[in-house]
Amino acid sequence: MKKIVIIFCCISLFIFSGCVNLQKSTTNGEVSFNDSFTEELTFPFNADYQQIDFFSPDKWDLWSRTENKLFHDFSSEDEIFFVEYKALDDFSISINNEMNVSEGEIYLIASNIFLPKGNISANFILYDENDNVIDWVGGITTLSPANGYQSLYCLIYVTSEIKKIRPRFIGEGNTIAKIKNTVLYKIENKQKKNSCIENDFLKVCCDTQTISVTVTDKRNGQVYEQCSENLKGIIFTESSVLENEIQLTSYDKKGKPIIKSMIKFNSENQASLDYSLSMPPDYTFDSFSFPQKSMSKENDYLVLPINEGMCFDYNDEHAFHGELVTYSGHGLCMPFYGITNQITGAGFVSIIKNPDDCAVEIKMNKTNCVGPNWKSQKGKFGYDRNMIQTFFTDGGHVAIAKEYRKYAKENGTLVTFEEKKQKRGIEGAERLNKLMGAANIWCWYSDGKNHTADTLVSQILEAGIDRILWSNNQNKEVISKLNDLGVLTSRYDIYQDVMNPAYYNLVSYIHEDWLPQAYPNDIATNKDGSFVQAWGVERKDNKGYINCVALCDITAPYYARQKIQTELSMKNFGSRFFDTTTASSLRECYSSAHPMTRTDSRKSRFELLSISSLEHKLVTGSETGMDFVVPVCDYFEGMMSLGPYRREDAGRDVDKFFDNVPSQILEYQLNEKRRLPLWELVYHDCCVAYWYWGDHNNTFNDQLIWDKRDNFNALYAVPPMYWIKNEEHLQSNKERFVKSYKSSAEITKKAAGTEMISHKFLTPDRTIQQTQFSNGLTVTVDFSINQISFN
């Protein structure tokens, strides 16, 4: 183990003597400078260390987004650089030239900073061979205000695509800082580059410097590679190989061992790898990617459970790029991702076993790449993170979905309708039977006449739409009449939005489901003590919105038990719909009265829905969908509607109908070339999926768009959703509603409660597709001519 003690020089990274000095030390030498600030760095690996002090004040570029608000000075006596920024946006201080670098080099910025106000970050701008920026904030680390000087470190590993770097400091908002004793270090890592393990199915090699993994499937010769991306200031320097595993150790910017990573063969499946990531639970942590992103190749496509599911070809520059969290209905609704070859069907699936604090990131790096990014638990590492990656030789996206279905069954997430019926007794089973094939109809009944909902529903039934889920709250008598008509009666409910009662006289409406008694004591609290913001409500004066705040999930079950029990004693609902519960992200709460991690949030939301489904035997629905609630939730409104590609303001203009079709609807939302029924392949026999109430079957007046939604309903064997404004709207569109419903009704009824066992693209252009169900039902849809057929 090599140890270097550095007594940092009294030379600022910004204000130097006007020349470039290179002092090189190898082995166990001590490099000392005349200053009182001492920091010990331990790098326990075979390396050369090169300390670089350089550049006078005129060698630095100072930039601010707001002009004339960045002030600086230099004290030559104690060699302190002073900076003050008097604006709310950002500023930077960087060297005015890029530095040429080579693969395998490691660069470290170390500085001593007094920060009484604002924030300062050290990072590197990273450039490729064409001087394009790869990353504006490579290896970024950030300081928060504190009394006295703090150490700030930033470290990067130079990967193959990085050809130049530019060290810099950046800040945001009103900031005051004193910066001294800054050193730039170049470290040449001489560690062994590769470690490998092998069994009868797979050969696995890990680049121990970049932690990128190459897997060769020995059954078909397929090679799977990962990107070598920057590791956010972490160096992996030690590796050991056992019979079935590779163990890696990394060191942080102070040279302390912090991360233990492991890649090993799964004990039950030779074609599977287990990845694990360990740190001290209280280690300050933002995010970290392990393993690195997997690269797609020619003829591959990415498989992502964005709501029902999507695929993006390996070279699709318009694929979704960015992060999709695994703890929100507007991320990945099931915690996995995969890549498969559309010709051979070979590929892999990666299952995130700790989804509460994780995201999956997709980016273009010559081809589309995808991998996990582990998030902190309230700013700390918290607990070990695990992922399982399984390789297969055929089956494509169906094999990916079925491998996850097997995992969901093993961990208790997959609970079928038949199992739910057994748990809920005769009355609960009868209610679930009403859900099968039921059109989900929303109506706020605004025709101004003295008609009641049962009048409208009777007309819908008489027209031929014979199974209905109705979720608009009505009085006791109307609910009884609807029940007598065989309708599955439900009502909208929400346990997220709470409006400050002081604003009731300012907003355009007061929602019956707000909980004024929860304000302010039971509201979710941010780290800075502010309340978590929720739905914005229009002001009476039309001058914008006033936000609700979010109820802390831990407190929600208490309010739900009181409310639901009281209401059911008066109204015999058969169902209940919980808005936002499985759409909004799991939350952290920093209240001392009800602190909450995202794991606590998940457990509380599960309990909330179980009050309805298990305690009261009601058919239970929620918005968009996350699969951890499948055991206690029976339908999702929005699972069919791909979240990133809905029309603008789909959550607000729910009762409007549109002539113009936005481009994202055609290119993504209803594009059969990009959609996959992943949710149905996993959970068709457990839950019913609907379109979103602002993205329903009749959202657009264009009949071709309506037809296409009907086609997807038939192919996936899921019932439609309609918005009906009033009786006049029903009568003027009755034939179209009935045609739409009947285009899939027989299919959805026959397939109800069955497993979807297969989905195929029957033509290379993916316009003809086929699904098959466990009872033998086969559905074929030709999207090019809007033709539906089934056996």
Language model region names:
Residues 8-16:
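Bacterial N-terminal signal peptides
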Residues 491-566, 658:
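Active-site-adjacent "subsite" loops/lids of carbohydrate-active enzymes
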Residues 28, 136-139, 190-499, 620, ...:
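Carbohydrate-recognition beta-sandwich/jelly-roll modules
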Residues 171, 279, 781-784:
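Asparagine-centered strand-capping/turn motif at beta-strand->loop junctions
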Residues 26-196:
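Extracellular and organelle-lumenal recognition/adhesion modules and their flexible linkers in secreted
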Residues 206-215, 342-345, 363-413, 429-435, ...:
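Active-site-proximal substrate-binding groove within the catalytic cores of carbohydrate-active enzymes
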Residues 1-4:
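Positively charged n-region of N-terminal signal peptides that target proteins for export
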